[in-house]
Amino acid sequence: MDKSKALSAALSQIERQFGKGSVMRLGKNDRSMDIETISSGSLGLDIALGVGGLPKGRIVEIYGPESSGKTTLALHCVAEAQKKGGICAFVDAEHALDPVYARKLGVNVDDLLISQPDHGEQALEIADTLVRSGAIDVLIVDSVAALVPRAELEGEMGDALPGLQARLMSQALRKLTASINKSNTMVIFINQIRMKIGVMYGSPETTTGGNALKFYASVRLDIRRIGQIKERDEVVGNQTRVKVVKNKLAPPFKQVEFDIMYGEGVSKMGEILDLGVKAGIVEKSGAWFSHDSQRLGQGRENAKAFLKANPDMTAKIEAAIRQNSGLIAEQILAGSPESDADGEEPMEE
């Protein structure tokens, strides 16, 4: 039996039945080879992700404790997409989006589509319709924990309805996943952390909404607040660590640290300084920072202020970091803990 003839007959039958392009050779499908990305708003995180940003046409999950910077990171991604002329939507299931803060992060709130649904089914139906339109570049669902099933809303307080939210998420993701890929829309699910009862070994932490999202997500980011940034006695920001817990596009388990300043978001200047020093692009001698024999300032805060006042110098250093990121990514992210043998490492506090 001639295998090539049999294959040709099978392919032509499939194309007659389901349309041209139902089956194709992977190498001839250029779109599947090139991954289009949108910057996360953090240069270090873009490098940690291995593809220069968060992938379009995929599902991304950002989870962490309260006030760790989940919504901030998602809004930075919206701002970056809007800079490229993209259309973004925000499904605000928590009814807690602050437009003033979003504007400070660089989001064009006049062009941002927002929905504040009454229940989980409505939220996911709206998300599905927007994704199927093919016009949306980034869609954010904030948050999975707030997607309350209609049956729970209509029931009494204290009613036991086990697995209802997990079933809702599982069904929604089955419907959404093909549309997301075809429309090349990035869908970011923000999620919260809960504690599992009776866990003796390993981390007791888990995310809400069942296991479906863990499987369907191409990228999962664990974001944690690890310290405070103070000016004298006043707290002006958080030191934040993001760990790439899952990555279908590049090696996972990389982690990166950056500052989130109140009212400003991710501190781009601080990140450029830190990454520049690790890459050898910015020289640090004692407390002085310099680049190409040009002094940037004494102390980190003064050097950040200098970079903020000199955007040309900032752009030059950032370009050098991006250019070398392929070579220095491993050094920048050195010290990332190795994964466990089963592929999922325990989450840190």
Swiss-Prot record:
Note the InterPro entries from the entry: AAA+_ATPase, DNA_recomb/repair_RecA, DNA_recomb/repair_RecA_CS, P-loop_NTPase, RecA-like_C, RecA-like_N, RecA_ATP-bd, RecA_C_sf
What is the protein name for this chain?
Answer: Protein RecA
Entry keyword Acyltransferase: no
Q: Which PROSITE patterns match?
A: RECA_1 (PS00321), RECA_2 (PS50162), RECA_3 (PS50163)
Q: Which organism is it from?
A: Rhodopseudomonas palustris (strain ATCC BAA-98 / CGA009)
List the SMART domains hit by this protein, alphabetically: AAA
Q: Which GO terms describe its molecular function?
A: ATP binding; ATP hydrolysis activity; ATP-dependent DNA damage sensor activity; damaged DNA binding; single-stranded DNA binding
GO biological process annotation, one example: SOS response
One cellular component (GO) term of this entry:
cytosol
* Subcellular location(s) of the protein: Cytoplasm
Q: What is the lineage of its organism?
A: Bacteria, Pseudomonadati, Pseudomonadota, Alphaproteobacteria, Hyphomicrobiales
